[in-house]
Amino acid sequence: MGLRILSEQERQKKIDDKYSAIIAQLNGVSKKFKSSKAPSLEDINLEVYQEDFLSILGSSGCGKTTLLKMMCGLIKPTSGKINWPTSNFQNSVENPANLSFVFQEPNLLPWMNVYDNIKLPLKIYKENSYKADEEIYDIINLVGLKGFEEYYPRQLSGGMSMRVSIARALVTQPKVLLMDEPFSALDETRRF
């Protein structure tokens, strides 16, 4: 097959098709905690499209984590609405296998080795529990954990623990992946 140059119309149609599906909408989302005088977040409006890669930047304490926790249903907004038009969950996670969240802290189960920590979501969401060991090992290789499968969390550095958390989030092949500072614990030479 030879090289084919797309016309401007064809190129624009490909872009339009890619971004035609809005997967998340935030309309006037605000959050005020009872312990705070000012809102943590105020009147956030956002559309996230299929295949988007979106980074939320800001200083410490500006509400990035709060926003992500609201998007995945861990906390509710004080006002406004979060919609997931193309997903099976609305304002709360009714089908968590469609969404994965990587927290700032890895939250690994200390009595499980790396392999079992990664496989845990497949055991919880039984529809994916048939996943072959080969696929799990592909994810282990992808995040740079080959050779660490039998290690326990206490034997891992902070960066390696975060890799386990990222692998665990990827194993269900979620439609939406939310990550809260996932690379902060990884050293420069070991980042993906």
Model-identified regions with their sequence ranges:
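ABC ATPase NBD coupling module
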Residues: 87-105, 124, 129, 133
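The feature captures the beta-strand-to-loop junction immediately N-terminal to the Walker
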Residues: 57-59
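Conserved ABC ATPase "signature" region
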Residues: 130-148
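Catalytic Walker B motif of ABC-type/P-loop ATPase nucleotide-binding domains
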Residues: 177-180
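Short coil-to-helix segment of the ABC ATPase nucleotide-binding domain corresponding to the Q-loop/switch region
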Residues: 112-119
